[in-house]
Regions:
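Short, solvent-exposed secondary-structure boundary/capping segments
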Residues: 20-34, 102
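Short linear sequence signals and composition-biased patches located at protein termini or domain-edge surfaces
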Residues: 47-180
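A structural detector for beta-sheet-dominated domains
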Residues: 6, 17, 29-31, 62, ...
Length: 180
């Protein structure tokens, strides 16, 4: 199991095996094996430091078949935690885009550019994440088709030429451990 040990000054990620777990304490075994556990101390942490398990969450868009036939699919935002079965979070999410704010100069006060994941030159320079979602209504409404195109963080989609209502949502998340 992977854990994060952190206080306000230091952070360390390590692998360990719980050997005694009660309601108030967990003892961690530190047997050394290739690529998993530490062979040296990980540093001096302040009082109040926290040890928490690493949680891996994957977010993705997947079609949900409501009934047979292509007209009956519904795109939705799903999440899978630590490889578990995915759960549907939000129905109608057609597009999910992420761009990463890069601090080229290293002063950690400004974002010099936003890039896609495959263009991140150094993940240590990422100081923010820009997210965009295009969400559609579950049902078609009215008589007019949607002739619009939508710019989801630089990816232009549409026109869809259906009668669904759509909204574009964007937000920027600052990574607090990366900024001053």
């Amino acid at each position: 199991t992977r854990f994060v040990l952190s206080d306000c000054d230091l952070i360390s990620v390590f692998a360990a095996t719980p050997i005694n777990n009660t309601a108030t304490t967990t003892d961690l075994a530190r047997p050394v094996s290739a690529g998993s556990n530490l062979t040296t101390d990980i540093g001096r942490f302040n009082a109040g430091a926290l040890v928490t398990p690493v949680v891996t969450a994957q977010y993705f868009i997947q079609d949900t078949d409501l009934a047979p036939g292509p007209a009956n699919y519904r795109p939705s935002l799903f999440r899978s935690i630590n490889g578990a079965a995915p759960e549907e979070l939000v129905e109608g999410v057609e597009i999910l885009q992420a761009r990463y704010g890069i601090d080229d100069a290293g002063e950690v006060t400004t974002i010099d550019q936003y890039v896609t994941a495959d263009a991140v030159p150094d993940w240590n320079r990422v100081v923010a994440v820009n997210l965009g979602m295009l969400i559609r209504s579950p049902e078609e409404t009215g008589t007019d088709v949607d002739p619009a195109t939508y710019d989801v963080l630089g990816t232009v989609v549409g026109p869809f030429n259906d009668r669904r209502q759509r909204t574009l949502l964007t937000t920027t998340i600052t990574l607090r451990n990366r900024t001053k």
